[in-house]
Amino acid sequence: MTKAMEELLTSNLFVQQVKKLYKVGELLGLDLDTLEALSQPERVIQVKIQIRGSDGKLKTFMGWRSQHNSALGPYKGGVRYSPNVTQDEVIALSMIMTWKNSLLLLPYGGGKGGIRVDPKKLTLKELEDLSRKYVQLIHNYLGSDVDIPAPDINTNPQTMAWFLDEYIKITGEVDFAVFTGKPSELGGIGVRLYSTGLGVATIAREAANKFIGGIEGSRVIIQGFGNVGSFTAKFLNEMGAKIIGVSDIGGGVISDDGIDVNKALEVVQSTGSVVNYPEGKKVTNEELLTSDCDILIPAAVENVINKFNAPKVKAKLIVEGANGPLTADADEIIKQRGIVVIPDILANAGGVVGSYVEWANNKSGGIISDEEAKKLIIDRMTNAFNALYEFHKRKFADQDLRTVAMALAVDRVVRAMKARGLL
């Protein structure tokens, strides 16, 4: 089989997630009927979105919302705008959200949405029309106790503001808790902007303390310098880590002397890509992933570490800032090489923890300061890591942390489904 064919077969995120689920199912002793129930979403909504472009021509886009599991509470997960969105990807990401919310003991199930669109090719008015039309088509399946969307790739607080306004217009329900990641004027909280990066950095610090002698002076490479990657870099830098490599879709840069995170952000704002950072060595994303470092944080897209480049990874610790950045085959190779992996369902859960704080605040009508919210996120992430670490050491020391994290998450969902008579 050719390398191209191998890459094609391992690129489907849904297939990879089902493989991981069945591996955990064997560990927990789950029967095939239960695994089948867990591997399929409860509902997938597919919509055809048509808007009139600024040129007067009709534009058509496909959109989805996957509602994977609601045993523990309403569906919760982001909505992404990307030309690469597929139904399988959205389903897989909603499954990951189920495990993530369960692991963090949040009162949510898993959901995810997406529209297949290149937002860079749309005007601001076209983006607004697209966003409003999406809510028009799926509003019957949303609600603060039903399904609560949030920002994801290429969506932001403004997108959530459009979503919320359209939802209120259609339903007549002035319920700001239906969406999270909103502007502060609409019940959003400031920390939601950087809560995912804060969570990744917190988990990286805790993992470094346990596995590689501490975060102070650790050499860190981050693939992806968008919201998650840039804030992760900022917080790790404040914690004493040394950021030696960063990249985005345009490529990356490595500097053994360390990268000035604020300067890198200025370069991105002025030139469009961190690859234009004036110091250090220019590298491709592939080269960045296999460069020498203590901590590697893939914070871009899924499946970037596969069976072909996993043998070349030089990091001692991998912290998954993105969803599903390692294929199942890469997982096995990395495990055999003794590299510790902190899985996505824990590492990047700061975003949904931030969303939970916002949602709970909206539901209660309370007021919370950014410092209080930040502390809640750090404490929740730290406690979740410590619980996983102790459980792993006590019960499943022969298993990798991803398997144990998923085992904890899946077991809680299964117990909830059994209690409700769903299994």
Swiss-Prot record:
InterPro entries per the UniProt record, alphabetical: Aminoacid_DH-like_N_sf, Glu/Leu/Phe/Val/Trp_DH, Glu/Leu/Phe/Val/Trp_DH_C, Glu/Leu/Phe/Val/Trp_DH_dimer, Glu/Leu/Phe/Val_DH_AS, Glu_DH, NAD(P)-bd_dom_sf, NAD_bind_Glu_DH
Swiss-Prot/TrEMBL keywords = NADP, Oxidoreductase
List the GO biological process terms. Answer: glutamate catabolic process
The EC category is oxidoreductase
Q: Which GO terms describe its molecular function?
A: glutamate dehydrogenase (NAD+) activity; glutamate dehydrogenase (NADP+) activity
Catalytic site: 112
What stretches pass through the bilayer? none
Question: What chemistry does it catalyse, as a reaction equation?
Answer: L-glutamate + NADP(+) + H2O = 2-oxoglutarate + NH4(+) + NADPH + H(+)
**The EC number(s) this enzyme carries:** 1.4.1.4
Q: Give the multimer and partner information.
A: Homohexamer.
Q: Which family does it belong to?
A: Belongs to the Glu/Leu/Phe/Val dehydrogenases family.
What's the protein here called? NADP-specific glutamate dehydrogenase
Identify the gene encoding this protein. Answer: gdhA
